[in-house]
Amino acid sequence: MASVKKIVDKMKRQPNGISPDEAGQVLDHYGYKFDRQSGSHKTYINKNGDVQTVPKKRPTIKPVYVKQILSKIGE
């Protein structure tokens, strides 16, 4: 597995090539915990109640989700 720092760098450089597992790994590292799965989306929540959904059905997630994650982790 790649380190979280490498994944975040990849998210900044190439936001359209991030897998759902990589996104989940980054969210876990920054304090988000897997909450539930509903349909084709996984839901992560942090201790402040901030929620981030990540689609799991496609091999890569759309850039809009990557931008949301980067914004929420402060990058």
Each model region followed by its residue ranges:
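Basic nucleic-acid-binding interfaces
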Residues: A2-S38, D50-E75
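Active-site beta-strand termini and strand-to-loop segments that position acidic
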Residues: Y44-N48
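Major-groove recognition helix of helix-turn-helix-like DNA-binding domains
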Residues: S40-K42
